[in-house]
């Protein structure tokens, strides 16, 4: 007979649902619990078998055993050891025991969840601060309530254990952040024994958004990915199910760690098409398995940083203006977008999580819903003005020209009575040019010339340029969708949305030490072989890409910086975010204006050395195909 949900309980091995009464008082008042003193009697389970399915049938007023119920007896004792003969008492005590067991398990589950959340939070914070700050001590961990409630043997004692817990969280599997053909390629390499030192270049063939340059970002996340790259036992098992890999190959993957060398352009650097942003040298299988993860981190971050720098540049026409990043609700990777936008020059973010993780300035205005919450616009403005010392009012919920008059009256009144200040007004729709001019005039006439006018609403660098060229009286901008998606301009036929960097093999050293230049022959997609360096003219007249062994051009600056050696991070190679942002702004100021423009007439000159060009011809002859320009 099925057990009614209101009175019964079904216990399963790993999934417990106990719809017990809320209190022992309620239990004693129920018919089935009469005569039971639940506060003084306890059951002792003398069985040694594992937990099995048990069912309590309350309609029969007895304990029913299923086929899998333990056959060993349960002794029911009073606190003093006297056996309990009453079946109702036995049933009630069994119920209490199950309830207590359930509560204990719930507590353990909560503790595990709290520790995992704590570990995740600590790891995320550690990923975005300079390496010298990434120390977690026992005293730090003991401040966590989840940590302090755990048994001594279960406590987390080191950052590596925190990382391990986080890596087990759903959705974080660095070893699986590859395309299917990467482990397939590694398997062919394993079968054939070809695993010599291989050099890959990560670069892009064109600049995004019809511009001339790229603002490099994403290196820190890329290096975190490299350091974390490994396969867990569950992931190895998964790979064994989707492909018939040899078990010895899977054993190698289980212990695989990156042992190679990485050189890269620092975050905040300016780069141009065909210049390697990163040079990776490692045994082939290690290097090939990193391809997709490195491209994903660098592609997105560099795209957004470049987009942000263009938007900020467009906003500076005539005088400085601040740009706030409002992209969270439209961004595919909001934290990456916020961090990269800050590198690109945005003054703040609307996303509190990003402000918390990266210590960014947070900013916000007012939603239309808050204005609509009140019977009248004046009451809404009054409530906002009363709540904050400095506040922003949204003017375009109904009619911005009526709203500005109401805003002025409220601002003057609350300034006199409370000392609160109207800091800004926001326009999100309508005729922003005409309305902003009208509003600026009204504010100035009312003696509120310090109040800024913020514009938002599907803006990008081209729309901002149009607004300012049309004479819009805007002091700052909030940009969301275009920034969060890195979109181009369909109206102007300018693509966007992806950077398109590639990761190409350029050099190979076999087990005998013989070196081989590697080249792809594919028209405009043909590659340049060899281990390269990049040098920049001090006045930004040109960049030179040459072979690593060629002498440096006189007075030119080397752009590559070593980041990782023998699989270990080089101290100081990842500066804090504030320094990255400062470097980016310095480089953007030095970039000649003709190359920083939204559209460029000619690309920045990047020259390939004679030695590099000769090696390309030599490598193409090795594969019996001439280079097609």
Which residues are covered by each model-predicted region?
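Short, intrinsically disordered low-complexity segments enriched in Ser/Thr with adjacent Pro
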Residues: 3, 7-12, 29, 36, ...
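Short hydrophobic targeting helices and cationic amphipathic motifs
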Residues: 18, 33-34, 38, 59-62, ...
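Intrinsically disordered, low-complexity repeat/linker tracts enriched for polar/charged residues
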Residues: 93-133
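Gly/Ser/Thr/Ala-enriched C-terminal appendages of enzymes
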Residues: 151-196, 200, 209-212, 444-446, ...
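Buried, small/hydrophobic-residue-enriched core segments of structured protein domains
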Residues: 151-197, 206-208, 244, 250-259, ...
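N-terminal, Lys/Arg-enriched amphipathic/low-complexity engagement segments
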Residues: 198-254
């Amino acid at each position: 007979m099925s057990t009614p949900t209101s009175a019964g309980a079904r216990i399963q091995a790993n999934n417990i649902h106990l719809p017990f009464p809320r209190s022992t008082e309620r239990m004693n008042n129920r018919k089935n619990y009469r005569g039971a003193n639940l506060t003084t009697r306890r059951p002792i389970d003398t069985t040694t078998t594992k937990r099995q399915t048990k069912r309590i049938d309350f309609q029969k007023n007895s304990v029913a055993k299923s086929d899998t119920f333990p056959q060993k007896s349960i002794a029911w004792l009073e606190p003093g050891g006297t056996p309990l003969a009453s079946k109702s008492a036995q049933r009630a005590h069994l119920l209490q025991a199950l309830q207590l067991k359930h509560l204990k398990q719930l507590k353990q589950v909560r503790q595990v969840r709290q520790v995992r959340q704590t570990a995740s939070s600590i790891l995320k914070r550690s990923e975005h601060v300079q390496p010298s700050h990434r120390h977690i001590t026992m005293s730090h961990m003991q401040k966590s309530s989840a940590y302090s409630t755990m048994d001594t043997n279960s406590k987390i004692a080191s950052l590596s254990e925190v990382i391990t817990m986080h890596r087990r969280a759903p959705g974080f599997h660095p070893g699986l952040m590859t395309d299917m053909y990467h482990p397939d390629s590694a398997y062919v390499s394993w079968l054939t024994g070809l695993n010599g030192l291989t050099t890959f270049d990560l670069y892009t063939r064109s600049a995004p958004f019809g511009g001339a340059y790229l603002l490099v970002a994403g290196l820190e996340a890329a290096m975190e990915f490299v350091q974390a790259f490994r396969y867990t036992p569950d992931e190895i098992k998964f790979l064994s199910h989707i492909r018939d890999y040899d078990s010895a190959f899977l054993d190698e993957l289980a212990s695989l760690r990156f042992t190679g060398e990485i050189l890269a352009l620092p975050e905040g650097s300016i780069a141009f098409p065909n210049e390697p942003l990163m040079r990776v040298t490692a045994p082939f299988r290690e290097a090939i398995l990193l391809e997709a993860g490195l491209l994903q981190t660098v592609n997105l971050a560099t795209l957004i940083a470049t987009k942000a720098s263009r938007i900020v540049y467009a906003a500076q026409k005539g005088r400085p203006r601040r740009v706030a990043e409002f992209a969270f609700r439209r961004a595919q990777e909001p934290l990456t977008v916020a961090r990269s936008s800050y590198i690109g020059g945005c003054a703040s973010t609307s996303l509190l999580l990003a402000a918390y993780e990266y210590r960014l300035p947070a900013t916000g205005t007012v939603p239309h819903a808050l204005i609509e919450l009140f019977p009248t616009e004046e009451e809404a403005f009054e409530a906002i003005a009363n709540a904050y010392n400095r506040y922003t009012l949204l003017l375009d919920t109904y009619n911005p020209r009526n709203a500005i008059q109401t805003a002025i009256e409220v601002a003057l009144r609350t300034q006199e009575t409370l000392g609160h200040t109207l800091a800004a007004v926001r326009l999100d729709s309508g005729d922003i040019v005409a309305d902003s001019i009208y509003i600026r005039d009204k504010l100035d006439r009312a003696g509120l010339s310090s109040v800024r006018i913020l514009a938002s609403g599907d803006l990008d660098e081209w729309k901002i340029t149009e607004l300012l060229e049309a004479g819009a009286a805007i002091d700052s901008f909030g940009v969301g969708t275009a920034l969060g998606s890195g979109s181009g301009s369909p109206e102007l036929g300018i693509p966007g949305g992806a950077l398109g960097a590639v990761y190409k093999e350029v050099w190979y050293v076999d087990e005998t030490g013989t070196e081989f230049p590697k080249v792809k022959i594919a028209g405009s997609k043909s590659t340049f072989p060899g281990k390269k360096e990049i040098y920049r003219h001090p006045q930004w007249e040109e960049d030179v890409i040459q072979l690593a062994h060629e002498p440096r051009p006189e007075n030119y600056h080397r752009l590559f910086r070593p980041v990782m050696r023998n699989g270990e991070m080089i101290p100081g190679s990842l500066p804090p975010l504030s320094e990255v942002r400062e470097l980016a702004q310095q480089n953007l100021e030095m970039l000649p204006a003709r190359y920083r423009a939204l559209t460029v007439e000619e690309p920045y000159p990047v020259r390939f050395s004679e030695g590099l060009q000769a090696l390309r011809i030599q490598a193409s002859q090795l594969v019996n195909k001439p280079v097609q320009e």
